[in-house]
Each structure stands twice: as C-alpha cells, then as structure tokens.
Amino acid sequence: MIRETFHTDSKIKQVLFNKKSEMKLNYRLLEARFIDRPNRFLTRAELNGKIVESHLPDPGRLKELLKPGVQILLKQENGENRRTKYSTQAVYDGSTLISLNTLLPNKFTAHLLTEGKINFLKGWDIYKKEATYGKHRFDFHLQKEDEFMFLEV
C-alpha cells in the first residue's frame, strides 16, 4: 500500500512500507493555488501571482479535492493548438499528493514493478501493458515463471 506521496521539483516520490522509490519526470511541476473550475476540463489557479487556466485531464467531479485555496501542481505545456498553457497534474489533500493525471499512476506502478519495490509483487515481470482479456482491458499483464496475472491500477 502507498502510505505517502510527495513531490520535489520534477520528482514524484512514494513511500511503500518504509521503502522509498522515486521516478524522475521529464518535466517540472509548478506549484499553484486552485481558484475554481469553470467546467469539467478546465481549472483556474494562481501561479506566481497571476491567474492562469489549466487543462484538467480528469473530468471526474473531484469536489472533495478541488477546493479554493488548495495547492495543485501544474505542468507547462507547449503547442500552438492548445487552449491552455498548463495542465493540472496533481492536488494536495493535506500532506497527501493525489495524481489528477490518469497516465502517471500507471507509469509509476510500472517503475515500481521493474524496481521490485512492491513487496507482494516481487518476482513478477511486466509481460504486457494495456493487455486485453475478452472484452476487458487491464493495465498490466504480469508473468512470474509459468504463471500469469492481470493487474489493474
């Protein structure tokens, strides 16, 4: 189980059963204060004294998390066709950092699996990502010698 998550600059760290693991991101996370959410895919935040709009990749309600004044993490985006210059990556709930980027938890889980940092999954290798079984899709298809298992993050 993940006990604590926190960030420093471009690193996301998680503590699992007192074992630290970190995954370096190829982008910087910018600290901002959440103001409001005009629609499902847009947030407004205060970043370095300026109000900016940011794309929110998670269209869920998130009312328990996105409250005025909470700290959020933004990623600066490049692209001429983008409506916003930022995307909202995570939000703090107290001292716990919660990912709002639906791709990041799978990347981090793959990293932890590869590093052998998840105790109950030691020895299991990633056989395939985004594996299908019948009409279902799973985040990971794992293999340990002649055994196989599906894992959903």
Residue map of PLM features:
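Structural detector for short beta-strands of small beta-barrel domains
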Residues: 27-36
